[in-house]
């Protein structure tokens, strides 16, 4: 398998591990698997660095991913099989792949041990389309508004993670690099939050593919200018939804996200200014 194809496989593996962490109900298991999803994301970052250094182009194409399972054990077995498919394409003589092999063999061993204890099994309700939110009583209007918001924003955060990762990989400017890292971290938090909320409502879904036109040969300054406008709109959406939803806990979370968008605007304007100064 060539490195470009391997990159696609690693991208898909990151999503499979990440969305498994959202789908599982047990908090301890969720957190354990999420930690490995973040390791898979680091693998992806290192591999993108490797591709750039070797002047090999890459993109964020992916095949359709069928993530729906009925039990925790089905997920554990699924992830073991998916990891094995990736590992067989690594060159263990290269340090980057030796590291990936070490990480993923440990993860497979952990999943194998989890499979040995029936207490770790459990029903998965992330796809039951109940559109309920635990014991919270949401009216129909609130449910509809929250459902639409989660589908739109989960894709948007996934898109931003990939776009900022791509721009970060190709920038030579340390300030821009650090700003992109902050934005990636923020979007990781938001995607985790929205993914878990979708799972709780039984509407979990893998985001659609991010098209090449959004990141390859992109005018980054214009992207950031447009991004400021999008962040302002996102703030308004969060504020409107927080006001519309008849639940204090969810409203407070959305208000928190709204204020996070404020700081995103500050960071993006700082990056725009730096780009202007370097021209």
Name what the model sees in each region.
Residues 1-279:
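Non-heme di-metal
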């Amino acid at each position: 398998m060539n490195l470009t194809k391997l990159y696609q496989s690693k991208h898909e593996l990151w999503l499979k591990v990440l969305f498994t962490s959202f789908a599982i109900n047990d908090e301890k298991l969720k957190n354990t698997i999420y930690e490995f999803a973040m390791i898979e994301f680091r693998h992806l970052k290192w591999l993108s660095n490797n591709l750039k250094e070797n002047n090999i182009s890459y993109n964020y194409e992916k095949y359709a991913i069928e993530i729906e399972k009925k039990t925790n054990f089905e997920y554990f077995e699924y992830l073991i099989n998916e990891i094995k498919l990736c590992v067989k394409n690594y060159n263990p003589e290269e340090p980057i792949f030796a590291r990936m092999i070490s990480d993923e063999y440990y993860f497979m061993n952990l999943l194998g041990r989890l499979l040995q204890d029936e207490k770790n099994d459990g029903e998965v309700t992330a796809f039951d389309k109940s559109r309920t939110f635990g014991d919270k009583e949401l009216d129909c209007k609130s449910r509809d508004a929250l459902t639409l918001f989660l589908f739109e924003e989960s894709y948007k955060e996934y898109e931003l993670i990939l776009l900022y990762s791509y721009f970060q990989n190709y920038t030579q400017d340390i300030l821009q690099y650090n700003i992109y890292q902050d934005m990636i971290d923020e979007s990781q938090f938001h995607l985790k939050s929205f993914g878990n909320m979708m799972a709780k409502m039984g509407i979990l879904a893998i985001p659609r593919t991010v098209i090449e036109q959004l990141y390859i040969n992109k005018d980054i300054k214009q992207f950031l200018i447009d991004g400021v406008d999008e962040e302002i709109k996102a703030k308004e959406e969060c504020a409107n939804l927080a006001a519309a939803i008849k639940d204090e806990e969810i409203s407070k979370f959305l208000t928190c996200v709204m204020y996070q968008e404020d700081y995103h605007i500050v960071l993006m304007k700082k990056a725009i200014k730096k780009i202007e100064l370097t021209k």
